Amino acid sequence: MGAPGLETRAGGPNGKSYLLLASVGAAVLGTLLLSVPITVLTVLALMPQEQGGQVADPSGPGGQLLQQLGFHKLPVESRSDLSPIPPAAHLIGIAKSSHGLRWVSGYEEAFLKSGTQFLGDEGLLALPQDGIYFLYCHIGYRGRAPSGGEQFRSQAGDPGVPVTLSSQLFRARGASGSGEPELLLQGFETVTPPVQHARGVGQGPLWYATVGFGGLVQLRGGEKIYVNVSHLELVDFRRGKTFFGAVMVG
């Protein structure tokens, strides 16, 4: 009697419903498993391929489908959009005969960039573009204190008077076209070299000083700048001591 009861349950309406639901669920799951990879492969096949630096036209069928699916081509920055090196110059001072100073543009760390020109015979630095420039100047000085029994004499001839060292940066012929140079930046330093009071003979101790400055100046293209330096006989020409330059910053 127990066996027929089991057969009645399996073959009844409820058993058939369970079998039907299981079959439908398996069919739906199989369809989903097959459709997902097929969709992915289709999208990959329709994506624009880069060939020889050229990207497929997004207006074509593949590009339109990608846009509908949410894919958008990002803009590519061209090399022409990159800013060029701004005008810049760095000049180095070297010794000239008979206590002179000469600026050079092709020595050690000196350089000229992006259209800047240096007129060596006149000592003028020409700037090619309108803009705001950072101008700077650094002059090193050194000397030797008088030996015992001597008195230090300033360049004016007064014994024992401190020396005021100075350097000035000018715009040649001025911005107004008046023909007069225009002072842009300047720096000063007053030094009193030590006097050696020892009784022995020989040279006194060395002393060192620096006059440096920098600032922002608005210049027009083609304008020229130059530097005036005092006490040329005391200028320090060792590496990294005496230089001036300009770089456009805006």
Swiss-Prot record:
Q: Which residues cross the membrane?
A: 27-47
Under the heading InterPro entries, the entry gives: TNF (IPR006053), TNF_C (IPR002961), TNF_CS (IPR021184), TNF_dom (IPR006052), Tumour_necrosis_fac-like_dom (IPR008983)
Those parts of the protein on the Extracellular side are 48-250
GO cellular component annotations of the record: extracellular space; membrane
Sorted alphabetically, which keywords does the UniProt record give? Cytokine, Glycoprotein, Membrane, Signal-anchor, Transmembrane, Transmembrane helix
According to its UniProt record, where is this protein located? Membrane
Cytoplasmic face: residue ranges?
Answer: 1-26
Which domain of life does the UniProt lineage start with? Eukaryota
Q: How does it assemble?
A: Heterotrimer of either two LTB and one LTA subunits or (less prevalent) two LTA and one LTB subunits.
Give the protein's recorded name: Lymphotoxin-beta
**What organism is this sequence from?**
Notamacropus eugenii (Tammar wallaby)
